[in-house]
Amino acid sequence: MERKAETKAPVPVIERHKSGYIKIRVAESLQDITLALKMYREGFTRNAAQRAFMAWKAMISALTVMNLDKLPRNEEERKWYHRVGYKAPKAGLRWLADRLEDIGYQDYKLTHITSTALALHRYA
């Protein structure tokens, strides 16, 4: 009699490379904000605004991945976080900031900074 192998749900890619992804996104954020400041000083305000937005998006992505176990409230949200949420898509940026504040980041004014970042993105 042949035994069927137990099939486990595959581990999402982001879970396998969590710490590396966080380090890369934080480094990207720091590089982008440094570049944004340089561009701003040189008079390239629209380019600087876009770089500042990208820096914030990378930071929200890093915070999201750091808290992947705490953020989802149900199975549907968990799937979304593992599929696209960890990338901090522009359309979900405000929602991610709200969720991060809900789980303990309220002192950092993430929604306020996110609103400013989105305004910079519109300007760019």
Placement of each model-derived feature along the sequence:
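Solenoid-repeat scaffolds in large eukaryotic assemblies
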Residues: 48-49, 55
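Charged alpha-helical initiation segments
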Residues: 1-45
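Long, charged low-complexity segments
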Residues: 68-124
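Short, structured secondary-structure boundary patches
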Residues: 10-14, 20, 61, 68-73
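Generic preference for hydrophobic/aromatic residues in regular secondary structure cores
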Residues: 12, 24, 56-60, 117
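Amphipathic alpha-helix face/heptad-repeat signature
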Residues: 25, 51-52
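Alpha-helical solenoid scaffolds that mediate protein-protein interactions
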Residues: 36, 55, 62-63, 69
